[in-house]
C-alpha cells in the first residue's frame, strides 16, 4: 500500500509543477502571475492579479532598482576612489581606484592600469532561460514517475496475491 501512496503523492507534485505558468517574453513572473514589467527605474509595489494590473512606484532619488521589488541606496565612492558613472534610477554608481587612468570610446568605458599597460575587460555571461530548465525538469520528473509506475505494476502483478485473485495477473506474469 505504501508504494501506491508514494505514487499518488508523486503525481500530485507532478501536477503542481505542470500548473506553473510560463510567461511571455514581454511579461515577468511575479508570484504565480505573469505581469507586465514596471518601467525603467520603477519597482513592483503590488503584484498583478487576473483582474488588476501590476502597481509600480519610482525609486526615490539616491536609490536604484535592485531586482523587481527593491530600491537600493546608491554607493558613495570613498576618498581612494574616483566616480566613473553617476548613480541613476536604473544603475548603481561605478567607482574605481584613483591610481587608474580612464578614457572613453563611443558608448564603452575602458580603463587601463598605468603600471601594467594592459586593458581590463569585464565579461558578462548570459544566463540560461528558466523556461528551458523548467521544461527539462518537468520532463525528467514525468519520466521518473512513469518508470516508478511501471515498476510498481510489475511488482504488483508478480505478487502471489495478485496471481491468485486476478486472471490478468496470471497472464501478465507469464509474459514476463
UniProtKB/Swiss-Prot annotation:
Localization (cell): Membrane
Positions of disulphide bridges: 59-71, 74-87, 77-95
Keyword Glycoprotein (UniProt): no
Broad class of the protein's primary localization: membrane
Keywords attached to this entry: Activation of host NF-kappa-B by virus, Disulfide bond, Host-virus interaction, Membrane, Repeat, Signal, Transmembrane, Transmembrane helix
TNFR-Cys repeat segments: 58-95
Matching SUPFAM superfamilies: TNF receptor-like
Membrane topology: Single-pass membrane protein
GO cellular component: membrane
Purpose of the protein: Activates NF-kappa-B in a tumor necrosis factor receptor (TNFR)-associated factor 6 (TRAF6)-dependent manner, causing the up-regulation of the chemokine CCL22.
Protein's name in the database: Membrane glycoprotein UL144
Upper taxonomic lineage: Viruses, Duplodnaviria, Heunggongvirae, Peploviricota, Herviviricetes
